């Protein structure tokens, strides 16, 4: 455990922010730097079959140290950080023995406050690693990486019985490309766990069904003084479209298992407007109904337009709820829950109001629920992680490996 914090601080010092709308994978050069560093560290630790693909997926194996037909299992984290907030020049603050109250983030006005983030009340006495208020921290998912690397070291140093342990570090998870180039056959694990969750005890095997909706609106612009009966304002059409979307089914109005429509971006002029929505729902039937709703809205608003003016809608599915795949293998969850209890942690099964690489991997034949990292408030300058939470994650990973070795 001694090197856990050292590893984490080393990894977050590298800017690995991914970038949307880029064809190449990984989308940024910084991700390659971390991948090459991890490859070097895995080789130094003596892992075998260490490979780094041209698409930036790093894989390695810690060979079994006990005989028998023990299933190979995997642990996976992603190297990129969110495009939503800068990941350059991350300057972590270490707050030992947190005593409550606000934590100043750097020398500006930003604070980490229990008024805004009540979870802090539960973390008294712990060591918090925060940002300086200028960047995100990168615990999502460099905490997961540090935890996997430390767990490998613990398994080796303490000679804990285990089967083959596969590990993988992927790029571009935050822009939805993390699993698209993942070679499940080469990974060769019976099942895996992403280490990409939040607070201690979280175990997630349900996530949103997800789709993106891109709407192109073509209008007609003329001088406003002579516009009657001629102008078709694309911006007005965009406003009408959004007015038809249920206002009480937006991200800021929903929680738990509730789905939503989210207008993520809108831009345009009288001539042309573009809207980008994301649709999310845990229930597959409701998910399909939401997509139909968007098509109906576009058809309604576009009815009667001049042929040269039109509304074009393109819907693309992004990922699906992995629950339907994971529940076919209940022992995967049983082992994780038992491992947590053995580490004095009460498992908290909760839905992911988002997605992980594991969602896509589960539909590619690799059932892959998600384990906690001990981090909070991802994707922004209030992100933080607890050292104690990271240590617990290491213990759970090690215990999962140990329990799996007992399933001969």
Swiss-Prot record:
<dbReference type="GO" id="GO:0045148">
    <property type="term" value="F:tripeptide aminopeptidase activity"/>
</dbReference>
<feature type="active site" description="Proton acceptor">
    <location>
        <position position="173"/>
    </location>
</feature>
<keyword id="KW-0378">Hydrolase</keyword>
<dbReference type="InterPro" id="IPR010161">
    <property type="entry name" value="Peptidase_M20B"/>
</dbReference>
<feature type="binding site">
    <location>
        <position position="196"/>
    </location>
    <ligand>
        <name>Zn(2+) 1</name>
    </ligand>
</feature>
<keyword id="KW-0479">Metal-binding</keyword>
<dbReference type="GO" id="GO:0006508">
    <property type="term" value="P:proteolysis"/>
</dbReference>
<dbReference type="InterPro" id="IPR011650">
    <property type="entry name" value="Peptidase_M20_dimer"/>
</dbReference>
<dbReference type="GO" id="GO:0005829">
    <property type="term" value="C:cytosol"/>
</dbReference>
<feature type="binding site">
    <location>
        <position position="140"/>
    </location>
    <ligand>
        <name>Zn(2+) 1</name>
    </ligand>
</feature>
<dbReference type="GO" id="GO:0008237">
    <property type="term" value="F:metallopeptidase activity"/>
</dbReference>
<dbReference type="GO" id="GO:0043171">
    <property type="term" value="P:peptide catabolic process"/>
</dbReference>
<feature type="binding site">
    <location>
        <position position="174"/>
    </location>
    <ligand>
        <name>Zn(2+) 2</name>
    </ligand>
</feature>
<dbReference type="Pfam" id="PF07687">
    <property type="entry name" value="M20_dimer"/>
</dbReference>
<keyword id="KW-0031">Aminopeptidase</keyword>
<keyword id="KW-0963">Cytoplasm</keyword>
<keyword id="KW-0482">Metalloprotease</keyword>
<dbReference type="InterPro" id="IPR036264">
    <property type="entry name" value="Bact_exopeptidase_dim_dom"/>
</dbReference>
<protein>
    <recommendedName>
        <fullName>Peptidase T</fullName>
        <ecNumber>3.4.11.4</ecNumber>
    </recommendedName>
</protein>
<dbReference type="GO" id="GO:0008270">
    <property type="term" value="F:zinc ion binding"/>
</dbReference>
<feature type="binding site">
    <location>
        <position position="78"/>
    </location>
    <ligand>
        <name>Zn(2+) 1</name>
    </ligand>
</feature>
<feature type="active site">
    <location>
        <position position="80"/>
    </location>
</feature>
<keyword id="KW-0862">Zinc</keyword>
<dbReference type="Pfam" id="PF01546">
    <property type="entry name" value="Peptidase_M20"/>
</dbReference>
<comment type="similarity">
    <text>Belongs to the peptidase M20B family.</text>
</comment>
<dbReference type="InterPro" id="IPR002933">
    <property type="entry name" value="Peptidase_M20"/>
</dbReference>
<feature type="binding site">
    <location>
        <position position="379"/>
    </location>
    <ligand>
        <name>Zn(2+) 2</name>
    </ligand>
</feature>
<dbReference type="InterPro" id="IPR001261">
    <property type="entry name" value="ArgE/DapE_CS"/>
</dbReference>
<feature type="binding site">
    <location>
        <position position="140"/>
    </location>
    <ligand>
        <name>Zn(2+) 2</name>
    </ligand>
</feature>
<keyword id="KW-0645">Protease</keyword>
<comment type="function">
    <text>Cleaves the N-terminal amino acid of tripeptides.</text>
</comment>
